[in-house]
Amino acid sequence: DKRGEVSVVLKTDGTLENLTASVNAALSDRASMDCREAAAGTADSFYGTGGFLQVVRDDGYSRPFVGACALCDNETGNAEEFFAANFEEYFTVSEQLPTRFAFYLGGGCDYFLAALQALPGCGKNWEVSAKDKLAAVLNEYRCGKSAAESATSVFGEISCEEERDLRYRCNCSAEYLKGVLSTLGKDELESILQEQGAVKIHCRYCNKDYAFTRTDLADLLSRLGK
């Protein structure tokens, strides 16, 4: 089904205030980040000392699953270790599915993620094995191999079933945002139009600005008035 979407929200009390990312079933993704200035006289801690990670899985049928966990590792300055530790915490706490991650953030479009999940009967030492396997896969990738080649090199008994490209694409549009505005109700929209002359929206994902005049919203206001 191409209507599903997964969203991740990360909030900390450090310089990184909010990080939001989402990807749909067509592998179109978008993301935004908000940062705050460090208080005067304090050490600049990017991840702070507290916060939470939230994951929303929407199957497209208005049945979203929302899970969350407190951040467990804010001390490391290494982004790869930070994300790996906290996603592992999320899967353990919220979904009760032990998972190990390996991240590579090379800058720009050069990034890599590998994950291994425990299955019934995997044994008590699976974590050690998973850690070693992930380190080996990551090393292969850093040596110039593709993601599929890296996995096949370490897990020789498996093969890549499918390769798909991820692309950055915002799904905002005038029609989509009118649907969002409908949740404000007619009275609120009328008040904004009266005070400002237009309802203005800034998309934080693609930085596009929208301005809806009374003429633009005539049909919506008519429907809301019924």
What are these regions (language model features)?
Residues 1-160:
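Interaction interfaces in information-processing and related assembly proteins
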Residues 131-226:
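Cys/His-clustered metal-coordination modules, chiefly Zn-binding fingers
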